[in-house]
Amino acid sequence: QFEDEKCIARQTMPAPAQLLAELYREDNGKNTDTVYPDHEQLIQDIAVAYRTVIQELYAAGCRNIQFDDCTWGMIGDPNYQNFLKESNTKVEDVAAEYLRLNNLALENRPEGLTITTHVCRGNYHSTWASEGDYFTVAPFLLAQENVDAFYLEFDDARSGSFEPLGLVTTKSPRLENKDTVIARIHEAEKYIPLDRLCLSPQCGFASCEIGNKLTELEQWNKLKLVKEIAETVWGK
């Protein structure tokens, strides 16, 4: 009921690394350690749970899954990096663990199943939770995570300088200039072939119950703009 010849339904879910991060957020870690005194066993059980769900979704007909993952946005945030430093924790060690867990969950996935990931920086009522560039996480996330595509937030300067990206924000009703976005896409060709690039909104329009500061019509106008640009660049 969610698909037709032009549309493929997508199932989104928190990334395995996101689940792990939530299990240790603030005081959650005490309860988690009580249930899982062996941290490696927790890693393995999360991976098995995700592999099971992925197989079940595929059996039910799902062919497109997206991991929503705030962990990489946090790792790139200077404030979070300072927090880790004060905790005598290396940023590289955290990134390596998140990468390993996500890839464990992706093992033995069914043929013909597309799995992508969206690096989210928070999207509460047109605000955000983290900022900073992608250079800290790029050697882990972009170079080694075994997904088919990355949906990366980059709608203003808070995301740092990252030349291949130019996206359409979901936090503001203002429509981006079509020619400017197209120019950014072609700029990205300096780094990645055009047939490996895609255009999407920067995040969801309602990542929480209250949603962002856009009307329904303004949201549809954003999606219409994305569609028009995609057809101009890649064809219908």
Task: Indicate residue ranges for each PLM-predicted region.
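Domain-level signal for soluble alpha/beta catalytic cores
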Residues: 1-236
